[in-house]
Design a protein with these regions (language model features):
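Extracellular, disulfide-bonded carbohydrate-recognition/adhesion ectodomains
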Residues: 1-222
Length: 222
């Protein structure tokens, strides 16, 4: 069948939503994403590192709930990292640290559940403390990068939740942590294609920031 692969003008990456009837686990989605190709470039579960990128991805999956993206804290509980694509190199890029405690005199976090007054989508840890609560999402006084958790997430509920979905429970662009083996109510996953690790888009039809290109099906840019 046809594919819809859409380019973001801000990241220059291409994105593809893969719907999976009956659900799919994060582990299986990660493997599946890395077997997909577009214009000669291998895919990976999307890494969302800015508000504009998050909004773009959310705009492409408005009718989908619980869609896997490339974040995990499977190595160290509460140490959330992008573990796929270019951000997944060298142990992954940390974007959030959500474990209680103090490191070198700096309060890392009050709890997994952020105070109701705090923003859930933050670009830096400083943005989450307008109400005077201790900084959450920081370690060794290094600010977090972008994150957009749903209220009271991540919470590592039950037996452990080490992977992330976007569009959690009808909340467009909001993230939640779930077990890596969870597949019920998962609508699919988002694949990102970008030029990294020596890979370049091979097709002359792929023109960055163009209005549209075609690769065996409808392929749009925005």
């Amino acid at each position: 069948g046809s594919r819809e692969v859409v380019q973001s003008g801000s990241t220059q990456s291409f994105y593809e939503f893969v719907e999976v009837a009956g659900g799919i686990s994060w582990t299986a989605a990660r493997t599946a994403a890395e077997t997909k190709t577009f214009a000669g470039v291998n895919g990976y579960l999307a890494t969302i590192t800015s508000a504009s990128e998050n909004a773009f991805v959310a705009s492409r999956i408005p009718n989908a709930d619980n869609v896997w993206i490339g974040a995990s804290d499977s190595t160290l509980e509460g140490d959330w990292r992008w573990g796929t694509g270019p951000e997944g190199q060298n142990g992954g890029t940390r974007f959030w640290y959500s474990e209680d405690g103090v490191v070198n005199g700096v309060q890392k976090n009050t709890s997994y559940s952020p105070p109701a007054q705090d923003q859930d989508c933050v670009a830096t840890a400083a943005e989450s403390v307008a109400d005077g609560n201790p900084i959450r999402g920081s370690i060794d006084n290094n600010l977090v990068t972008y994150a957009c958790w749903a209220p009271n997430e991540p919470n590592n509920f039950g037996s452990g939740e080490d992977a992330v979905v976007t569009n959690w429970s009808n909340s467009d662009g909001k993230w939640n942590d779930l077990p890596v083996t969870y597949s019920a109510n998962i609508d699919g996953y988002v694949v990102e294609y970008s030029e990294w690790n020596g890979q370049t888009f091979s097709s002359s039809n792929v023109v960055k920031s163009s209005s549209s290109v075609s690769m065996g099906g409808p392929v749009l840019t925005a």
